[in-house]
Amino acid sequence: MEAVKETELVHRYDPAYDTTGITNEIALDGFALSDLELLGIGGFTPLTGFLNEDDYHSVVKSMRLANGAPWSIPISLPVSADQASALRVGERAKLVYKNDIYGVIEIESIYTPDKKVEAQEVYRTTDEAHPGVAKMYARPPIYVGGPIVLTKRVNYERFASYYIDPIDTRRIFAEKGWKTVVGFQTRNPVHRAHEYIQKAALETVDGLFLNPLVGETKAGDIPADVRMESYEVLLKNYYPKNRVHLSVFPAAMRYAGPREAIFHALVRKNYGCTHFIVGRDHAGVGNYYGTYDAQEIFKEFEEGELGIKPLFFEHSFYCKACGNMASQKTCPHDSEHHVILSGTKVRQMLKEGVLPPQEFSRKEVVEVLMRG
C-alpha cells in the first residue's frame, strides 16, 4: 500500500513562556487538561488552540474548520458565567489545573453554545443517558476560544514510558523503516476479533501502531493499567516484535461514534499513521449508532482529503465450524456456529467472575483481566 504524505505538526509547547503579569485565570477540568496537552504537542494538528466561535459553529455543522480543513469534534474550553465575566477578548489567561499553571490562552472568542444543537450534531442524540452528552451538559455553559501555549507537561506516573509524542512516534516509525503504518484505537482489552483485524491489516502495511486511549472513560470501562498489562502480554506472545509499536493516546473518550472515528483517524495521522482501522460501531456506546455508521461517515469526505486511508472491517467472530476467526466474507457457516466477541461481553463476564473462553481472549490476556 502506498504511503500518504505527512503533514507538518503544530508545536505549541514552550516551558520557558513567561506567565508573569497575566492576571486572568481559567480553571481546567481533567478533560480540558488532556485536550490542552494534545493541542500543545501537535496531537490535534491543525488546531492551534481551543476552537473560537467561527470554527466551533463550522465544526458542529459541517465537520470542518472555518477554513475548510476537516475536523469533526469540537475541542472546546468551557468556563462558568463567573469566570467568563472576568475575561475579555484580546487578553491572555493562565490555564490552571489544581493550582498549577499548564498553559496560556490568547482569547479570541467568548461565546455561549447551544448544547442541544451540539449534542444532536456531534453525538446524534440529545439523550442525557449518553455518556458523551451527559459529560458535555455537565461542563460549564460558556466557551472560550483562541490559540494556546502549553507551558507545563502533565506528569503521568503510570506507564510513563508509553506516553510518546507525535513527533517521536513519527521518528520511531521512520527508524523502523516503516513507510506505511496502520493505527488501531481501543479503550478495551484486545480480544480475538481485534487481533484478527489487526493482523489482517498488518498483512498489507509495514507496521501496526496500537494506540489505546487512556484518558477519561465512562464508569464500567476496564481501568487503563489493567488494559496496558493485557496489551503487553498479548504483543509479547502473539505479535512480531519488529512490526508493532505500542504507546498510549492521552485523550478523554467522547463516545461520539461516527464523528469520533473521523477524529481518531485525523489524530493518528498526526502520530505518523498512513492507514487507520475502523471496525464495527467505532467509538460507539449503547445502541446510539448503527453497526457501520462510523464507516459510512468517511464518504462525506473526498478521497485523500483526510490524509489517512481508512481500512474498513466487517464484524468478525469465532466460528466453531471453521475452527478460527472469520467474518461474513470468509465464513460459509450459520450463526449458530459463531461466537460473537465484544468488549462489552468481556467486561460483563469479568464483572460476574466468569472466565472468558479461549475463543474470546488469549489465555495470557484472560489471566491479566481476572487479576485486575
Curated annotation (Swiss-Prot):
Disulfide bonds: none annotated. The keyword Transmembrane helix does not apply. Keywords: ATP-binding, Nucleotide-binding, Nucleotidyltransferase, Transferase. GO terms for biological process: hydrogen sulfide biosynthetic process; sulfate assimilation. InterPro entries: ATP-Sase_PUA-like_dom, PUA-like_sf, Rossmann-like_a/b/a_fold, SO4_adenylyltransferase_pro, Sulfurylase_cat_dom, Sulphate_adenylyltransferase. Gene3D superfamilies: HUPs, Sulfate adenylyltransferase. PANTHER family: PTHR43509, SULFATE ADENYLYLTRANSFERASE. This is Sulfate adenylyltransferase. Its EC number is 2.7.7.4. It comes from the Bacteria. Belongs to the sulfate adenylyltransferase family. The gene is sat. Pathway: Sulfur metabolism; hydrogen sulfide biosynthesis; sulfite from sulfate: step 1/3. Pfam families: ATP-sulfurylase (PF01747), PUA_2 (PF14306). It catalyses: sulfate + ATP + H(+) = adenosine 5'-phosphosulfate + diphosphate. One of its GO terms (molecular function) is ATP binding.
